[in-house]
Regions:
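Transmembrane alpha-helical segments of polytopic membrane transport and secretion proteins
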Residues: 1-24, 60-63, 233-246
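Periplasmic/extracellular loop-to-transmembrane helix junction in inner-membrane transport proteins
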Residues: 11-42, 57-59, 206-213
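Interhelical loop and adjacent transmembrane-helix boundary motif
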Residues: 19, 24-28, 187-227
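Membrane-interfacial helix termini and adjacent extracytoplasmic/periplasmic loops
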Residues: 21, 82-118, 189-192
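Transmembrane-helix boundary motif in ABC transporter permease subunits
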Residues: 39-70, 83-85, 132-134, 140-141, ...
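Transmembrane alpha-helices
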Residues: 42, 126-129, 133, 137, ...
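C-terminal transmembrane helix and the adjacent membrane-cytosol boundary/short C-terminal tail
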Residues: 62, 123, 130-141, 145-146, ...
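Non-cytoplasmic
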Residues: 90-91, 167-205
Length: 246
């Protein structure tokens, strides 16, 4: 594996050294993947919730149009999403040139991965939360209105707690999608050791250079993380069924 300057190293790991490579393994791709996924989830959490809330209240025709638009990144190949992001945010594009004046550059930077991961993870958050909101008992909101409660209070103190299991499930799925993102990320930020390397791009680069042992280690780490995420999703689903909620 290429030496990654400035990477975060750990002397010990919960996994065996045969998998992790011990203290000599560079952990930057893991750290970078986790921070990109976490920051992406913060974005899709707020955008997904408010998009789902307002779309659910729209007329059927407009709702259908926006639903297709918001869900499109989920069915498009990730490389196509990355291509559109390059067209939009590339350093030679109008928006990219404008952002560069403020020192903001998405192409070939780690935070460009946030943009790519947010785009591909958003549909999962949006659709899951929209389903939770559509299953919400509207009589609860009407009761709150008759008591003089504001729409803001009803949203945050009634609707959100009732739909929390669906929201959490959507957030976990979005995190998993962002963590495993490869196509759009590789198109926008590429693979620069110590700067833009993620788990997915690192696995590909290691495989391409015939370093199968290191690639296998990263694959096993990714599988372990994904298994934990799936366990969390299943746990949330069981809690949701027991509560008889959304």
């Amino acid at each position: 594996m290429n030496q990654i300057t400035g990477g975060i190293r750990q002397g010990k790991s919960a996994l065996p050294d045969s998998i992790t490579g011990g203290a000599d393994m560079d952990w930057y791709p893991l750290w970078n993947s986790l921070r990109i996924a976490a920051l992406s989830c913060i974005i899709v959490f707020f955008v997904g919730i408010f998009a789902a809330y307002y779309v659910a209240k729209l007329p059927r025709l407009l709702k259908g149009i926006l639903d297709v638009l918001f869900t499109l990144p989920m069915v498009l190949p990730p490389t196509v999403c990355g291509y559109f992001l390059l067209i939009l945010l590339g350093s030679k594009r109008p928006l990219g040139i404008f952002l560069a004046r403020f020192g903001i550059q998405f192409a070939m930077t780690w935070y460009g991965g946030i943009a790519a991961s947010s785009v591909v993870a958003f549909p999962l958050m949006y659709r899951t939360v929209r389903g939770a909101f559509e299953s919400f008992d509207s009589s609860l909101a009407y009761s709150g209105q008759t008591l003089g409660l504001s729409n803001t209070y009803i949203f945050w103190r009634i609707r959100m707690p009732v739909c929390r299991q669906g929201i959490l499930a959507g957030l976990v799925l979005a995190f998993a999608r962002a963590l495993g993102e490869y196509g759009a990320t590789s198109m926008l930020i590429g693979y620069v050791p110590g700067r833009t390397a993620t788990i997915s791009t690192t696995v590909y680069q290691l495989w391409r250079t015939n370093n199968e042992v290191e690639a296998f280690r990263w694959v096993m780490i990714n599988i372990a993380i994904s298994a934990v995420i799936l366990l969390i999703v299943n746990m949330l689903e069981r809690k949701n069924k027991k509560a008889g909620g959304v």
